[in-house]
Each structure stands twice: as structure tokens, then as C-alpha cells.
UniProtKB/Swiss-Prot annotation:
It is found in: Cytoplasm. HAMAP family: MurA (MF_00111). The keyword Zinc does not apply. One of its GO terms (biological process) is cell wall organization. It comes from Legionella pneumophila (strain Lens). Coiled coil: none annotated. This is UDP-N-acetylglucosamine 1-carboxyvinyltransferase 2. UDP-N-acetyl-alpha-D-glucosamine binds at R93, R122, P123, V124, D125, L126, D308, I330. It is an enzyme of class 2 (transferase). Its EC number is 2.5.1.7. Cell wall formation. Adds enolpyruvyl to UDP-N-acetylglucosamine. Phosphoenolpyruvate binds at K22, N23. Its main location: cytoplasm. Pfam families: EPSP_synthase (PF00275).
């Protein structure tokens, strides 16, 4: 099993090119099932979850061609299987995203209940409730969601999510584009990745209004065409590298980004004492060798502070000047990195969904174990600033969401390498 060896204490300097967003690429790939012609998706990151989605689409009968630049062509005209099996779905929660498209286009889908990161239940009940309201007959039995469309086509409905759900919004959005009539989604997720999916669907002929707001209206069409689309850049990867610059007191520029999607993070970096310069598709952070100031964080749905950046800011706050409060409102059980950061000398107290972080002068390298995707990123960041060697185990978690992280950090001056026990 691979692990990362990090010798910390070096300020990071330089530029890093940000990859396409996994959380946009996965629903867009799932949405290719809706098209009657082939689609070509570019700026797709080379990640384990992407490979899993390709395997899943292939198992359903789609024909995929991938070139050396990770341009992915999907032809779903020959789809003839309607089962998303446990062996694929268990490794990636986003597999649930094939449910809406398969039900809308083919009228049936059997999808194993999803897996993914071990950060709470993240139930799919909200997806199923909305699809049932649109006319789907759904049962959950033996670990599978069995969905059938009773009337040939799903029916447009007025829907309201009890709580904001990104994958739920995406699943229903994809189902609604081929439904009969108009679907209105209230309390919809406003994340940029939802907007990116909507833009992809619109390019294929869908009629969607309001993506990026809390109310999305979809007028169903008979079919969708093929097309080409470039996936948006990964705002969480961008924030992670900016955090690496901040906690090592360095200067890091992230390129090929959309600064408008980073605003909640950028405000907090400025609050921490960073000097920011923002261009059309780049952001530069400079700490001028200053220790970051502690910043309070409360996660909430977009456009508020992203839960996927909580762990990285905790790593920064661990070595910041002062004390901070971090409140996690999205997922339970998302403080599993705390115990590992404490092994490195971090001073953190937990009380339910709140962490109190008292910044320390230095962290010390230690063997630590990643428990989920973003927790692994926080441990890598801590290793970059710690004295001595840090060994991060179970880095298959980080490979699910970060493309060549050790190579990109090395380009910024980090002493980091991947080794294998095999």
C-alpha cells in the first residue's frame, strides 16, 4: 500500500496548475447517459473516482474512448445493462448519480446503496423521495435501490428538498431534463459544480433556468443531443494549495482557476494575514514569511464556507497565532483528522460538531493515518510544516480527489515522495 514521506519545514513557493473538478466531472459523466449521441468531456482529472465512474459506465454498456490528455468520449447509445453493482458503487458514493439519468432515459435502474468516504451517513432518502414524487416506483431491498418508471416518462413536479443536497439536486436535475412537463426544484444546492452540470445539460439541449440559485426550473425535452464540454476547475484543490502556501508562510499561485468560486476561502486567507492578488484565471497568495492568524470557520452550503476545506483550515489553524473555533454543520463524524493532528502536537479540543484549535509554535513529524479524502489533505499539509519526517498512511484516500499531489507539491519546493510497501 502506498504512503507519503514528508520532510517538513520548507516554505512553499511557485505556481501550480489546478486540475478539473472531480465533483463536476462525475455528475457530467453520469449525465452522458442521457444523450442520444456521443459526448466528449475535457479537463477531466486523472483520479481513482473518475476511473471507477468510467468502469461503471462501461459496465452499463456505454462505449468510452479516453486519450492521453484525459479527454473522455462517451457513447451511451448501446446501453443495455441497468444495474450499478455493489463492487463498483461501494468505493464511490457518486455512483448514485447514475440513478436519475438511467431512470429518465431507460425507465429503470438498479443501483447499489453507495459507499465512499466514512464521514457519516449522507443518506439518499432525499433523492428517492423526489424521484417518487416524479412518478418513479422505488423499493430498497437487499442493499439495492430498484427504480422503475410507471408511466413511460417521469412527470414534472414541484419539489422541495428538506435540506440542501448537492448530489440530490444533481440527480433530480438530470432526471427532470427528460421528464414530461416542468419540474421546479426548491431549496436546490447552489454549488458551482451544480451550475457546471446544468451548463453541460443546456449545451446538449436541456431547458434549465435558475442553476446557481435556490430555485431551479426544468422544462423537460424528448431527447438530448451529444456535444463537447470542458469541466470547471477544482475549487477545493485550489484552496488546498493556497492553504499549503499559507501555513508554510510561503508564496503560491494557483492557475487555471475560477476566482469567483473561491470567495469564501479567499476571505478567510486574507483574514489569516495573506496578501492576495487575483487575476482572471489565477490567484496568488503571499504570506511574506509571516505566521498565519487563527480564523474561525463554520461550514455551510455554498456560497458559505465549504465543508471540503474544513480539514485544511484546521491544519493551518494548528500552527496559527491565536485560537479558533471550527464548526462543522454539513456532515457528522468529519473530525477524524483531529486525533492524527494531535499526534503531531496540535492542540485541539472537540465538543460535538465544534473544534477549538489553539495554535502552537510548531508541529512534529509523526506516522499518521488518513481516514477520508479531505482528512488526508490536512495531514499532508501538517506534514509540510512539521519538523522532521511525517509518514501519511492509507493515501488511497487522497488519490480519490487529488491528481499527482506529491508531484505538484514537489514543484512548489516540498520534500515529499510516494513509497510503496509492496
Amino acid at each position: 500500500m502506498d504512503k507519503l514521506l514528508i520532510n517538513g519545514g520548507k516554505a512553499l513557493h511557485g505556481e501550480v496548475v489546478i486540475s478539473g473538478a472531480k465533483n463536476a466531472a462525475l455528475p457530467i459523466m453520469a449525465a452522458s447517459l442521457l444523450a442520444s449521441d456521443h459526448v466528449t468531456i475535457s479537463n477531466v482529472p486523472h483520479l481513482k473516482d473518475i476511473t471507477t465512474m468510467m468502469e461503471l459506465l462501461g459496465q452499463l454498456g456505454a462505449h468510452l474512448i479516453v486519450d492521453e490528455k484525459m479527454n473522455v468520449q462517451v457513447d451511451s447509445s448501446q446501453v443495455n445493462e441497468f444495474v450499478a453493482p455493489y463492487d463498483l458503487v461501494k468505493t464511490m458514493r457518486a455512483s448514485i448519480l447514475v440513478l436519475g439519468p438511467m431512470l429518465a432515459r431507460f425507465g429503470k435502474a438498479d443501483v447499489s446503496l453507495p459507499g465512499g468516504c466514512a464521514i457519516g451517513t449522507r443518506p439518499v432518502d432525499l433523492h428517492l423521495k423526489a424521484l417518487r414524487a416524479m412518478g418513479a416506483d422505488i423499493t430498497v431491498k437487499n442493499g439495492y435501490i430498484n427504480a422503475r418508471c410507471k408511466k413511460g416518462r417521469l412527470q414534472g413536479k414541484r419539489l422541495m428538498f428538506d435540506t440542501v443536497t448537492v448530489t440530490g439536486t444533481e440527480n433530480v436535475l438530470m432526471a427532470a431534463v427528460l421528464a414530461e412537463g416542468i419540474t421546479t426544484i426548491k431549496n436546490a444546492a447552489r454549488e458551482p459544480e451544480v451550475v457546471d452540470l446544468a451548463n453541460f445539460l443546456i449545451q446538449m439541449g436541456a431547458k434549465i433556468r435558475g442553476a446557481g440559485t435556490s430555485t431551479i426550473e426544468v422544462e423537460g425535452v424528448e431527447s438530448l443531443n451529444g456535444g463537447t464540454y470542458s469541466v470547471m476547475s477544482d475549487r477545493i484543490e485550489a484552496g488546498t494549495y493556497l492553504a499549503a502556501g499559507a501555513l508554510t508562510r510561503g508564496q503560491v499561485t494557483v492557475k487555471k482557476v475560477r476566482p469567483d468560486t473561491l470567495l469564501s476561502q479567499l476571505c478567510k486567507f486574507e483574514e489569516a494575514g495573506a496578501e492576495l492578488t487575483i487575476g482572471e484565471d489565477w490567484v496568488s497568495l503571499n504570506m511574506h514569511n509571516k505566521r498565519p492568524q487563527a480564523v474561525n470557520i463554520a461550514t455551510a452550503p455554498y456560497p458559505a464556507f465549504a465543508t471540503d476545506m474544513q480539514a485544511q483550515f484546521m491544519a493551518m489553524n494548528s500552527v496559527a497565532e491565536g485560537s479558533s473555533t471550527i464548526i462543522e454543520t454539513i456532515f457528522e463524524n468529519r473530525f477524524m483528522h483531529v486525533q492524527e493532528l494531535q499526534r503531531m502536537g496540535a492542540n485541539i479540543q472537540l465538543n460535538g460538531n465544534t473544534a477549538i484549535v489553539h495554535g502552537v509554535e510548531k508541529l512534529t513529524g509523526a506516522p499518521v493515518m488518513a481516514t477520508d479524502l479531505r482528512a488526508s489533505a490536512s495531514l499532508i499539509l501538517a506534514g509540510l510544516v512539521a519538523e522532521g519526517e511525517t509518514v501519511v498512511e492509507r493515501i488511497y484516500h487522497v488519490d480519490r480527489g487529488y491528481e499527482r499531489i506529491e508531484e505538484k507539491l514537489s514543484l512548489l519546493g516540498a520534500d515529499i515522495k510516494r513509497v510503496s510497501d509492496r
